[in-house]
């Protein structure tokens, strides 16, 4: 088993004081959340999986295995936990220790979600390669099936009766008995995720709606916004959904009747989790915020996890703020997802110290200059640096790219 930059730490530099309820420690957008009675398991764009003591708001363990974004997390019956990533891998971690007991690499694309069966025997994963993976926890045996006609699986969840729900970009919701499809329901728009609300499946859509599904079709619908919804969580009593604009709505699980709306101020909210009394929101600012489920009131301070390291009031500094979440301008990386940009110009790609670059970047022959940095943001990382773990972000306007390059020339010296 080849472990990629596995790190572990106990209550180290990302430990929060006991009086602070928010969880600070990720250096990139928080894209995965799972909760147990006293723990939180998070994953983020910074490739880290963090296990938290929920009561003390303290990091218990920090792990790095995945190449790229950690897309899903789940707790397991034996006290261990699971993580899945953009790299197509599913890792099973023991309750104690810092190395995974099993790593499955059955998917050829990012994994959209994980779901534990009600009997605790099976972990299901759905991937953008259109396949479902069923992992038997006791034996480690894996079964993979083609599920959505080669289209992306965008969410999975188990109903209390043991049937698996999967949704995909082929605009279908499928109910599975084991690995056998038993019901297929057409969807009106592209689904972005699913969570189980009692005996129903709460599905979020790119058209800004949440729809509640039973075995015979739609039970309830709530149109929340004109923007795509990015995250969903549910319990037998409540459904929470979040948009790419950062709004969060809480609804009744029975009929999606509105309860309250939150504005975390975190940029896009990429992940949600519900307990009996709390809502947790994972934001684009790397912060996990906590809210009272009954009132919608914040439980923590809400201070931004990442601030601009340098601001001279220029347009370039304004454009830089989108980069500051994942990169620092100081000699160290500031516990962020990407390498420091200190001393950027004149540096060969993938040579900043103390950063675990992907193999694809280490093979490239690029030197960072004003011209190459501008081209990176003109065409995007997927085109300019294929194999990069960097999100495919672009700066479309030439004047904004020029302003960013001028700012970096000043700020990275």
Question: Can you annotate each of these PLM segments?
Answer:
Residues 23-30, 64-70, 104-111, 146-153, ...:
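WD40/WD-repeat beta-propeller blade N-cap
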Residues 316, 320-329, 404:
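The canonical Cys-X-X-Cys-His
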Residues 40, 81-82, 123, 164-165, ...:
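Hydrophobic beta-strand positions that form the internal "hydrophobic ladder"
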Residues 28-31, 46-50, 68, 87-91, ...:
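Short coil/turn segments within WD40 beta-propeller repeats
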Residues 369-413:
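C-terminal capping alpha-helices of c-type cytochrome domains
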Residues 295-319:
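Electrostatic cytochrome c docking/interface patches
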Residues 331-369, 392:
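Gly/Gly-Pro-rich "capping" loops immediately C-terminal to redox-active cysteine motifs
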